[in-house]
């Protein structure tokens, strides 16, 4: 694709999804099967409204079956499916209608709570609709009223899937055929949020009332090494703590417990719900404000503002005899902000650092931890 977007001052090329590849391959294969003529390029209108002109590769034609592939173009997005061939095989059936299934390298759903039911191929709703509509369009143009069986496959899919969330989500044997717009936007935050939502929905439909959240690897390591809990029980929020909490509320969870490094969670005390550094870095400002409220002043406050890390600031608090008081105040502030964010569910947080270990927790954290272990 030649189209691009500007993000953080950089010109980034767009790509197209595995769903677009599958739909285009199915459209091309259906055309060749029903017309009897070879087609080396195909046009596809994506749900986003952008039209793609795609090269058709690895064509196999027979009177009863046609198979072809579209090569995945991820643009400037660091996507593991880049350059993967997504195949569609189309054959006629005696039963009227279009049946869509997954073949080699396309995962199977083994757990409830996902876009597709247990046992179905991991071809999500929008790609399924795209495949259906494009194959129906070809049937209409060529006057075909019989049935078609469409199988989507990705020969490299089983290997690629090991690098994705699929094994964790209960999708076995391959990748998922994804995409809501048909277009890949480089480094899309929405794609990450959507992945978190899928995992939360799966937990909820599995009967969980309480959920453990962690921003990333530090939190996961602490959960395993210090708390003795399988880190797979936690949902990784990345920087999207606010979005994750709101999704928990919307999905009907009764409570959430967030466990994370102070470098991330201190930002919650300032109402920063996306903790990525590009949205600001108020760590020392918040810690210094809490320390000032407990009596820190003058040169010590100025020194804290200049600390490079939270562990440096904690060292200073120990020297000033304010360590426990400031952490207690910080936990209270985080508690207030989490309650303000999601007042209709129970919320809690536990903070730690790599150097000092356990630091503090909000007042409801221990109770939530017990409930999560029981849930």
Residue ranges of predicted features:
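Generic N-terminal targeting/processing segments that precede catalytic cores or assembly contacts
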Residues: 1-163, 167-169, 364
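Flexible, glycine-rich phosphate/dinucleotide-binding loops
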Residues: 159, 220, 358
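N-terminal charge/polar-biased segments
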Residues: 1-18, 32, 36-39, 140-141, ...
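Surface-exposed flexible segments
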Residues: 85-87, 226-229, 362-368
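A structural signal for small-residue-enriched, beta-sheet-centric alpha/beta enzyme cores
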Residues: 3-6, 13, 169-175, 180-199, ...
């Amino acid at each position: 694709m030649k189209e691009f977007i500007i993000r953080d001052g950089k010109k980034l090329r767009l790509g197209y999804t595995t769903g677009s590849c599958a739909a285009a391959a199915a459209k091309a294969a259906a055309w060749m099967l029903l017309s009897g003529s070879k087609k080396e390029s195909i046009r596809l209108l994506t749900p986003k409204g952008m039209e793609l002109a795609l090269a058709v590769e690895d064509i196999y034609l027979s009177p009863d079956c046609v198979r072809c592939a579209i090569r995945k173009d991820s643009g400037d997005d660091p996507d593991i499916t880049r350059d993967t061939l997504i195949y569609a095989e189309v054959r006629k059936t005696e039963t009227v209608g279009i049946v869509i299934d997954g073949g080699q390298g396309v995962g199977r759903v083994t757990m409830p709570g996902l876009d597709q039911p247990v046992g179905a191929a991991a071809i999500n709703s929008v790609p399924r609709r795209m495949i259906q509509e494009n194959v129906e369009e070809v049937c209409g143009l060529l006057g075909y009223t019989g049935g078609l069986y469409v199988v989507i496959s990705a020969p490299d899919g089983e290997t690629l899937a090991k690098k994705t969330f699929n094994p964790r989500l209960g999708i076995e044997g391959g990748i998922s055929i994804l995409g809501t717009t048909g277009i890949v936007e480089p480094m899309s935050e929405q794609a990450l949020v959507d992945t978190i939502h899928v995992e939360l929905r799966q937990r909820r439909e599995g009967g969980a009332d309480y959920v453990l959240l962690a921003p990333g690897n530090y939190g996961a390591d602490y959960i395993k090494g210090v708390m003795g809990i399988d880190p797979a029980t936690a949902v990784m929020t990345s920087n999207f703590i606010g979005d994750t909490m709101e999704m928990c509320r919307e999905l009907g969870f009764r409570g959430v417990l967030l466990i994370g490094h102070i470098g991330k969670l201190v930002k919650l005390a300032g109402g920063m719900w996306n903790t990525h550094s590009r949205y600001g870095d108020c760590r020392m400002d918040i810690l210094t404000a809490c320390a000032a409220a407990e009596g820190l002043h003058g040169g010590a406050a100025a020194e804290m503002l200049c600390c490079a890390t939270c562990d440096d600031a904690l060292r200073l608090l120990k020297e000033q005899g304010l360590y426990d008081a400031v952490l207690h105040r910080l936990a209270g502030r985080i508690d207030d902000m989490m309650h303000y964010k999601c007042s209709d569910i129970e919320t809690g947080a536990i903070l730690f650092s790599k150097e000092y270990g356990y630091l503090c927790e909000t007042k409801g954290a221990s109770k939530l931890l017990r409930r999560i272990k029981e849930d």
